[in-house]
């Protein structure tokens, strides 16, 4: 027994004393950090899908880190203090114990691997929005490198080529760590200007004044859709989520208007859009969140070479999705016109009817494009023929298939259109929304607007306008000012017109057309204006969108 233990100890000692020990531990740390993404890649997913879970976690971590700057600064000081002390001890020949060396080497590998994933996510999703996470990576990398090898020094002639290589790598690691740390120092020491806080009253504040209840209604997908569904959404029972406002007793109105919201590609869960839904419904409207299948695999779709022109595309995948949305809208019409109506709705609305003639319709990304097609579908039912607000956020290219082309020649006088793009959207082209605006030529210019949300990296946290601004996962100060303020005003305008409340309608209207009330984004803590929204009624005449035409 003792001999076996002795042999095991001998093997461990030989491993920790071998030249391969540092590289093996660094590789182990990197493997642990990459394990989830590697597993997803092995399962046949794309690189984008492989890093997506970590992208979502990164958002969560970063929002938490923003609230803990003092703790981060304290941790960084203590960690670096210990590592600098260990560095001096190393320089005097007193090296760290092997288990502690293994921890620091593994940490170096994990940090380097995590940083590589962060770079990919930053290019694809984050666009420089987050400072503290790379700063922490830099602190961990700097401290670990100092603790393991001591202060950096240049290679000298007394070293062999392996030693020179290790010394050079150590110097490069220190430089990389310093480069990661430097941008975050103003935030850590508290000298970077902070953005405006979310409004505490009025548009953009907490959703209100009404509480909400959500009821789910499944709908049947057409057979030609179910036969080509992919596996990523096979566990979903596609449904309409109806969110109902709790109005006071005897509100003195006939009914409440309707909103229809569509989600982005590969993101049917309502959990990503509850903030958007709450801001709409809390103003006094019923919101129908429609799930539709995005993982559909029509024949020839895998190697289809799409033609994308004038904000449209001819992907064959559009057809089964349009059939699904059409089925959902027919089911929605059944729900709101049923006699008697479902008890779950009557329990909340009592005698109030749902009035789709006063309509808000919109969506995010692919859902934004499909909301334009859905508007064409519901016009035949008289929906949106008295009040209409269209809001697409970072819309994708819409279907070009003839059977789904909308015709907006008979929109009501009370129509407002917001087609919104963000500066650092790396997912869809801004030209889509610019070209979609041509669909609404019959609406007067000040009612049909292309809105451009700029990024402002002046202070900390940075305000970076990405593709994901409307999703719960990216709900930050920029979203409060650039997005949720507009959503509140949009809902207020539709609800006010449904009630004949012209005073409220006029106030909301002033927040929705090309005025300072729409474009104002508040001020940084040092008094500098946050970059305002940019409004275009004729984007073809602007330099920013000239390449789209």
Annotate each PLM feature.
Residues 132-175:
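Cytosolic-side transmembrane helix boundary signature
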Residues 173, 183-254:
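N-terminal cap/lid segment of alpha/beta-hydrolase-fold proteins
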Residues 253-264, 278:
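Short beta-strand element of the alpha/beta-hydrolase
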Residues 271-289:
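Short amphipathic alpha-helix adjacent to the substrate-entry channel of hydrolases
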Residues 305-352, 373:
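Alpha/beta-hydrolase active-site loop
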Residues 362-371:
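Gly/Ala-rich beta-loop-alpha elbow adjacent to hydrolase catalytic centers
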Residues 384-458:
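The feature captures the conserved acid-bearing segment of alpha/beta-hydrolase catalytic domains
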Residues 445-549:
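C-terminal catalytic histidine-bearing segment of alpha/beta-hydrolase fold enzymes
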